Each structure stands twice: as C-alpha cells, then as structure tokens.
UniProtKB/Swiss-Prot annotation:
This is 5-hydroxytryptamine receptor 2B. The chain crosses the membrane at residues 5-26, 47-60. It comes from the Eukaryota. It comes from Sus scrofa (Pig). The gene is HTR2B. Residues 1-4 are extracellular.
C-alpha cells in the first residue's frame, strides 16, 4: 500500500516542481520582453490561477 502511494507522490511532487520552474521562467521571460504589460498580469488572482493550473497539470 505504501509503495504505490510513495511512487505517486514522488511523481506528483517532481512534476509540480518542474512545472513551477517552467511557470517562473515564462513569467520572467514576459517581464523582460514586455516590462510594461507584465505588471498587468501580476496580481493575487492571476498568481492563484497559475499555481492552480500547475497543480492540475501535475495531478493529471
């Protein structure tokens, strides 16, 4: 019972970590490429949406 759960959580957290790094990279790219427009997309609501999407992709 513990082994499949361990495997699932290992893959889940590894994928989530990689996806978070990708999201941070995209965010930094946009901040460099379009600095004026980047501030419009950085709010609590958009951060929550981005984090939720990353976790949903990781679970799926």
């Amino acid at each position: 019972v513990l082994c499949p759960a361990w495997l699932f959580l290992d893959v889940l957290f590894s994928t989530a970590s990689i996806m978070h790094l990708c999201a941070i990279s995209v965010d930094r790219y946009i901040a460099i490429k379009k600095p004026i427009q980047a501030n419009q997309y950085n709010s609590r609501a958009t951060a929550f949406i981005k984090i939720t999407v990353v976790w949903l992709i990781s679970i799926g």
